[in-house]
Swiss-Prot record:
Lineage: Bacteria, Bacillati, Actinomycetota, Actinomycetes, Kitasatosporales
Record's GO cellular component terms: plasma membrane
Top-level division of the source organism's lineage: Bacteria
Biological processes per GO annotation: amino acid transport
Cell compartment(s), UniProt: Cell membrane
Protein name: Probable terminal-alkyne amino-acid exporter
Topology within the bilayer: Multi-pass membrane protein
Described purpose of this protein according to its UniProt entry: Probably involved in the export of terminal alkyne-containing amino acids, namely L-propargylglycine (Pra) and L-beta-ethynylserine, that are antibiotics synthesized by enzymes encoded in the same gene cluster.
Length: 297
């Protein structure tokens, strides 16, 4: 059976986003947390700036700049720094399991600040997912792992804030446009880390530099473009369901690339986390249809 271009775009998105977690581990060797964070965003920002014209990315309105700044500060700047910091001691696959529960925090924020009523399924799903995160956090058996796991969980929280903050913007811009604006804003916020980036480019091993460029070009730039292409042509249910594949693919890539095997208890916690998110999404897919479609103005 011949697969459509949209399905192939979805496959590309899942694989590139999943491969980002082990690629971070490689990039940290030579760049460190600060250098890798800015380097990845810089590469992605340049790539998206070049592609912005052909892709029809419009200039944002001035009144939307504060919300764009919030999206950049949370979903790009803070997320990159926290995830990279956490992956210093947390295996790549384990980190992907923690990040997978980010939708939980988006739902909780919507309930608190937008007054969106949570269903029993959402409440139960949130409890299950957060319980899974707690299990993952203690799965390593030593203090450095546990501390780093909570840092990765903090990255999931700011990612949830990002998804929450994009809601009003997605009423006026495409998903790709919002991603571009946030990427560019996030890069500006991390410019104080420029010395670390320059030092990394000058001294890091070739593998670390190649991994850093890969992170910027594929997961951060091409990944957003392919995701936008796919969700504009496929059902929201299919697109959302595909994201459940990111952690399993990340686990496989991390094993093949780095030889990493996560703690068994982390896999149990990850299964709980994904199950909780699936329970939440059963009740939210209908409401997320408009916000998840990049072609919507």
């Amino acid at each position: 059976m011949k697969l459509s271009k949209a399905v192939w775009a979805l496959v590309l998105t899942v694989v590139t986003w999943a491969s980002a977690f082990p690629a971070i581990r490689v990039g940290l060797d030579g760049y460190g947390v600060a250098g890798l964070s800015l380097s990845r965003l810089t590469v992605a920002s340049v790539a998206l700036a070049i592609a912005a014209g052909p892709l029809g990315v419009r200039r944002p309105r001035a009144r939307d700049l504060p919300m764009i700044a919030l999206c950049g500060a949370t979903g790009m700047s803070a997320y990159q720094v926290l995830l990279n910091w956490g992956e210093v001691h947390v295996p790549a696959g384990t980190a992907s399991l923690l990040i997978a529960i980010a939708p939980v925090f988006s739902v909780l924020l919507a309930a608190v600040f937008l007054g969106e009523r949570m269903t029993w399924a959402q409440i139960a799903g949130s409890a299950v997912a957060i319980s899974g995160a707690a299990v993952i956090a203690v799965a390593g058996g030593h203090a450095r792992y546990t501390t780093s796991a909570w840092v990765v969980l903090a990255a999931a929280v700011v990612q949830g804030v990002y998804h929450f903050a994009t809601k009003p913007l997605l009423a006026r811009y495409t998903g790709l446009e919002v991603a571009c604006y946030a990427m560019w804003a996030g890069t500006v916020f991390l410019l104080p880390l420029l010395p670390a980036m320059v030092h990394g480019f000058a001294t890091a091993p070739v593998a670390a530099t190649a991994s850093t460029v890969y992170l910027g070009l594929l997961p951060s730039a091409i990944g957003f473009v392919s995701w936008g292409y796919a969700v504009a042509r496929l059902s929201v249910a299919s697109s959302t369901a595909s994201l459940y594949l990111v952690p399993p693919v990340a686990l496989v890539v991390a094993f093949v690339w780095l030889g990493e095997v996560p703690p068994p208890l982390a896999l149990v916690g990850g299964a709980l986390g994904i199950a909780g998110v699936m329970l939440i999404n059963r009740r939210t897919l209908g409401r997320r249809r408009e916000a998840s479609t990049p072609g919507r103005r």
